[in-house]
């Protein structure tokens, strides 16, 4: 399998999950401005949406959208317990979290990354997004991870989204439970490896 990624983007989430599964895979960097792959290919020919992440399977099939990719990967290695088994209620709570993170947190960043957003509107956007992290912080005051006490695909996604906060001047430092959680997740060997590989931290 091959993961097409851009360093520090939402593709970090499936990158982490891939490493957590122990599956064999390769990665190829994408320049989202030129829409070219690291090897010079036209990225739009691979994913006409022009977005990462993209997972290319060994048979050539293409899977896009991070929430779909992480569930697919987790199901390939059920022994890693990255997502609950089909039909288990726990699984749907995990999917509930993935959907919340995608619709409320991930999308909540969009105006902060856009040059079209009026300066006067930025505080409103930040306050709304901060409120989502306040809720998450409260959840983490009662348990080690977002879906309980063990790492799941939802944690890979939350960790990824939380990394963007400093880049948009969103202050989360007062959320102590969230900060403790992020420090713990960052210490996971597979998370550390993904961060180093993408050049986000030094070895």
Swiss-Prot record:
PROSITE patterns registered for this protein in UniProt: GST_CTER, GST_NTER
Domain GST N-terminal: from-to ranges: 1-81
Start and end residues of each GST C-terminal domain: 87-203
Q: Which SUPFAM superfamilies match?
A: GST C-terminal domain-like, Thioredoxin-like
EC number(s) given by UniProt: 2.5.1.18
- Keyword entries, A-Z: Cytoplasm, Transferase
| InterPro entries (UniProt xref) | Glutathione-S-Trfase_C-like (IPR010987), Glutathione-S-Trfase_C_sf (IPR036282), Glutathione_S-Trfase_N (IPR004045), GST_C (IPR004046), Thioredoxin-like_sf (IPR036249)
The listed locations are:
Cytoplasm
Report the principal subcellular site. cytoplasm
User: Where does the chain bind glutathione?
Assistant: 10, 35, 52, 65-66, 99, 103-107
EC category name: transferase
Annotated Gene Ontology cellular components are: cytoplasm
Q: Which reaction does it catalyse?
A: RX + glutathione = an S-substituted glutathione + a halide anion + H(+)
Coiled-coil blocks: none
Function, as annotated, reads: Conjugation of reduced glutathione to a wide number of exogenous and endogenous hydrophobic electrophiles.
Q: Which family is this sequence assigned to?
A: Belongs to the GST superfamily. Beta family.
What does the subunit section of this Swiss-Prot or TrEMBL entry state?
Answer: Homodimer.
Q: What is this protein called?
A: Glutathione S-transferase GST-6.0
- Say which species the protein is native to: Proteus mirabilis
List the gene name. gstB
